[in-house]
Amino acid sequence: MGSEMCIRDRDKLEEIAAAMAKTAKEAGVEICAGDTKVAGKGQVDGVFITTTGIGRIMDNANTSGKLAKAGDAVIVSGDIGRHGCTILLARDEFGIEADVTSDCAPLWANVKAMFDVTNDIHVIRDATRGGVGTVLYEIAGQSGVGITLDAEKIPVADEVKGVCGMLGLEPLYLACEGRLVIFAPKDKAEDIVSALRKCKNSENAAVIGEVTEDNAGRVVMKTEIGSQTLLPQPGGELLPRIC
């Protein structure tokens, strides 16, 4: 952080530190060390925070983007697209106002809740860069399988739908900072969704599709009228990255 910032925005720095402490406590994480750097005047325009996390590998977990299997259910841990939509509105480039808040949240409690009910989980991914749609295409390619989604089952907040409708954006490709994409056998899906819905920030968890042997490497969408269409794969970022 710049030396000027330490004086001019001391209150902001204290606010950030308090938020870090609150979130770490919520996630059960200890902040055990810290350091600061001083940069010359004009070299930075805000606060830069870099973290290194150290944890333990779960003994009962065996997940990978290469382990999705035909017959698996595709699950999301909550409604999608909130974070990307929130950042878009915060930039105030389109003059749109909507009551949308980011889904940013720690996810360890949600992961633990799933493994408390079953170890039979094949894939877990966060849906940050590129959103849920990009993650699904990556998993389909890594596992050599197809994925069929049901448009009616994908949870999207009405406010996010409205903003996306006005700007021609697809919620599936908006970043999520507090959502998981999970692949697990269909007979485990109900237990996983039930466990997630008891967790903070996962009240809208839902099964949104299934893994298929056909259409390998592709994601197909079953529309509200029952037809099927290939989900387009964007060639780049829909919105400028901020992280």
Language-model regions: role of each:
Residues 3-4, 8-243:
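Helix-biased detector of long, well-ordered alpha-helical tracts
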